[in-house]
Swiss-Prot record:
Segments forming domain S1 motif: 669-738
NCBIfam families cross-referenced by the UniProt entry: polynuc_phos, pppGpp_PNP, PRK11824.1
Domain KH: 598-657
Entry function: Involved in mRNA degradation. Catalyzes the phosphorolysis of single-stranded polyribonucleotides processively in the 3'- to 5'-direction.
Stated name of the protein: Polyribonucleotide nucleotidyltransferase
Organism: Rhodococcus jostii (strain RHA1)
Superkingdom of origin: Bacteria
GO biological process, one term: mRNA catabolic process
Family indicated by similarity: Belongs to the polyribonucleotide nucleotidyltransferase family.
Cofactor: Mg(2+)
CDD domains: KH-I_PNPase, RNase_PH_PNPase_2, S1_PNPase
Keywords assigned by UniProt, alphabetized: Cytoplasm, Magnesium, Metal-binding, Nucleotidyltransferase, RNA-binding, Transferase
Length: 757
């Protein structure tokens, strides 16, 4: 990697670059520019990736703080502009509407490392808007957006302890290098040969250049869709040790990106403004609350049950606040915040000193586990997974592949055959609240569970269905997202989906502090909601018994030693193995498909026969659908998906399609029980086979007698037993009626029987 300092390219326009060297995979250049666009924003930076991908990030701040807020009002928005890809939006009004799922997930990737980088107690509204203006279809813009947002915030004159660098690294294998190489900013094409990829964000805590000490702040990682086939081909599996190596490999790249942002800020940053901060409480308030509550609260926090513990804690809180409130009139909010801070202190002390947790468990203990399938009667697949007081219902629905979600965003994905939706109703925590469209958190949790399961799903050739998985968080006390992974695995198997391997997930936590003069770290397995809130790290790991399929990490620390992180990963693997054993007791192989699930079969027809199967204006395919009740979807490569509520209907449709695409030509002398499909002045057309009609001339219809009108003898829809009298050189078939004759039966065919051949 090479280093460049920021330069002034035009009057008031500055830029800096970070060149990422991936060895044999080439270099990527990230360029930051400020001073040209969006000059009224507090900070505005354009970030380029190799000059073709271009994002504008603008950071703004309100002039006056929101003193009544008890949280930091930071908003991050990502605007995908379709002109970035040279497209007109597909919506009715032909303009961009609500943000896509990709945009929402990118907002979360930006928010998670930026939010803890602001000074504690800030109450001014901060808004970061990232606009995707140009995008090379081989690039993914999310990590570029993290860097752009950090750079614009860094120069905005805000109390911000950045910059934050974000990088995507992928373990890409080749025939020559099965162990693989960690490549930064991989292209979409390169990711096809990757076994694992992750977005890592962090910042420099000391040093500079390649020797800088980088603190990891956020990780979002996943195994790729084709990881199992790559492993079968000899590639390195993404085990816990390999994932830890990837995190270390990302640090020099992050240092390079942070350095480029620092260089830009040195030239173009505004001086930090005077922003008032509103600490949650003053020291005198905390001292009073601690003196009054410490003993009672410590006792309350030893109660194992969540509801009983919360009730007792609330009781202590009311009692203590009534006791100390007269001494702090008008500072009620401080009292509540101090009580929460004391709770956090006591919980952490117990873990660090006694190695025991709120509910009495040891640091590696998992709460009681329960797994059950076939919960919802008419669902195609369902399961209930419980871990302590966390309860998740997973429900699987199968349908035709044409029901896959159509994705209209800037990402490379245009359709989603597997959709995972996560719902978190307010009653899951015993509260009231808004229900309706999903919040960003629900979209993020659903995406995490979706990524965890994608590597083990069968291909569309192996299982020609669209799959919708819904996770209902019925009760929550810690890591409903990882509970969703477990419930989904069970429900998918119950629905008959042939997963390549079962997947389970577990949430880990970390608590650290100075104990007896040294920093002590304690990794916690299966964290509670309170441990998540009061801990230093939230670390979710999902995977099979052999490798990691998804990982999400958020930390409040300036850095986690590699040894501690490796230990937490190993702890997570042990917990995952325990959970997989419990799940296997409920179901370990795919069940028979539900009688309520559609039967979908994939067949192939010659590409040049697609038009005949569809027919003029869809006449033939509509006819097959009407006669059989089956749903039919035809792909451009000749793959035909046939779905029906029962097997015989699907088979009838398949037979009719095969009769058209691979017809058995009728011969002179063959007899059929056909259907009259059209009458004319000169005769009646009779359908013998799908797509194959013959003509009975009017002179042959009267049994030797002259008739005036064809309709006097037959009408459309009439069944007529006929024999092929002649087939001319153009393939036109002449028919004659035959009498009902049992002796002729062996040589006769019905239209349906012929189709079954």
């Amino acid at each position: 990697m090479t280093e460049n300092s920021a330069v002034e390219v035009d009057e008031g326009v500055f830029e800096s670059t970070a060149v990422i060297d991936n060895g044999s995979f080439g270099t990527r250049t990230i360029r930051f520019e400020t001073g040209r666009l969006a000059q009224q924003a507090a900070g505005a930076v354009v970030a380029y990736l190799d000059d073709e991908t271009m994002l504008l990030s603008a950071t703004s701040a309100s002039k006056h703080p929101k003193e009544h807020f008890d949280f930091f009002p930071l908003t991050v928005d990502v605007e995908e502009r379709m002109y970035a890809a040279g497209r007109i939006p597909g919506s009715f009004f032909r303009r961009e509407g609500r943000p896509s799922t990709d945009a929402i997930l990118t907002c979360r990737l930006i928010d998670r490392p930026l939010r803890p980088s602001f000074v504690d107690g800030l109450r001014n509204e901060i808004q970061v808007v990232v606009t995707v203006m140009s995008l090379n279809p081989q690039d993914l813009y999310d990590v570029v957006a993290i860097n752009a947002a950090s750079a614009s915030t860094q120069i905005a004159g805000l109390p911000f302890s950045g910059p934050v660098g974000g990088v995507r690294v992928a373990l890409i294998t080749s025939d020559e290098n099965k162990a693989g190489q960690w490549v930064a900013f991989p292209t979409v094409e390169q990711l096809e040969n990757a076994v694992f990829d992750m977005v890592v964000a962090g910042r420099i805590v000391s040093g500079s250049g390649d020797d800088a000490d980088v603190a990891i702040m956020m990780v979002e990682a996943e195994a790729t869709d084709n990881v199992i086939s790559l492993i079968d081909g000899g590639a390195q599996a993404p085990t816990e040790a390999i994932v830890a190596e990837g995190l270390e490999a990302a640090k020099p790249f992050i240092a390079r990106l942070c350095t480029a942002q620092q260089q830009l800020a040195a030239k173009a940053s505004k001086p930090t403004g005077d922003f008032p901060v509103f600490p949650a409480y003053q020291d005198d308030v905390f001292a009073a609350v601690e003196a009054a509550a410490a003993e009672k609260l410590s006792a309350a926090l030893t109660i194992a049950g969540k509801q009983e513990r919360d009730d007792k804690t609330d009781e202590v809180k009311v009692e203590v606040l009534e006791q100390v409130a007269p001494n702090f009139e008008g500072r009620e909010k401080e009292l509540g915040a101090a009580f929460r801070s004391l709770t956090k202190k006591l919980v952490r002390q117990r873990i660090l000193r006694d190695q025991f947790r709120i509910d009495g468990r040891g640091i590696t203990d998992i709460r009681s586990l329960s797994a059950e399938v076939a919960i919802v009667p008419r669902a195609h697949g369902s399961a209930l997974f419980e871990r302590g007081e966390t309860q998740i219902l997973g429900v699987t629905t199968l349908d035709m592949v044409k029901m896959a979600q159509q994705v209209d965003s800037l990402g490379p994905e245009t359709t989603k055959r597997y959709m995972h939706h996560y719902n978190f109703p307010p009653y899951s925590t015993g509260e009231t609240g808004r229900v309706g469209s999903p919040k960003r958190r629900e979209i993020g949790h659903g995406a995490l569970a979706e990524r965890a399961l994608m590597p083990v799903l069968p291909s569309v050739e192996e299982f020609p269905y669209a799959i919708r998985q819904v996770s209902e968080a019925l009760s929550s006390n810690g890591s409903t997202s990882m509970g969703s992974v477990c419930a989904s695995t069970l429900a998918l198997l119950n629905a008959g989906v042939p997963l390549k391997a079962p997947v389970a997930g577990i949430a880990m936590g970390l608590v650290s502090d100075q104990v007896d003069g040294e920093t002590r770290y304690v990794a916690l397995t299966d964290i509670l909601g309170a441990e998540d809130a009061f801990g230093d790290m939230d670390f979710k790991v999902a995977g099979t018994k052999d490798f990691v399929t998804a990982l999400q990490l958020d930390t409040k620390l300036d850095g986690i030693p590699s040894k501690v992180l490796a230990g937490a990963l190993s702890q997570a693997k042990d917990a995952r193995a325990t959970i997989l054993e419990v799940m296997a007791e409920a179901i370990d192989t795919p069940d028979e498909m539900s009688p309520f699930a559609p039967r979908v079969t994939a067949i192939k027809v010659p590409v040049d026969k697609i038009g005949e199967v569809i027919g003029p204006k869809g006449k033939m395919i509509n006819s097959i659908t009407e006669q059989t009740g089956a749903n039919i979807s035809i792909e451009d490569d000749g793959t035909v998906f046939v779905g029906a509520t029962d097997g015989p209907s699907a088979q009838a449709a398949i037979d009719m399609i095969n009769a058209i695409a691979n017809p058995q030509l009728p011969k002179v002398g063959e007899r059929f029980l056909g259907t009259v499909v059209k009458t004319t002045a000169f005769g009646a057309f009779v359908s013998l086979l799908p797509g194959r009609d013959g003509l009975v001339h009017i002179s042959k219809l009267g049994s030797g007698k002259r008739i005036a009108k064809v309709e006097d003898v037959v009408s459309v829809g009439s069944k007529l037993r006929v024999e092929i009298a002649d087939i001319d050189n153009r393939g036109k078939i002449s028919l004659i009626p035959v009498e009902e004759d049992g002796a002729a039966a062996p040589a006769e065919q019905s239209e349906e029987a012929a189709a079954e051949k």
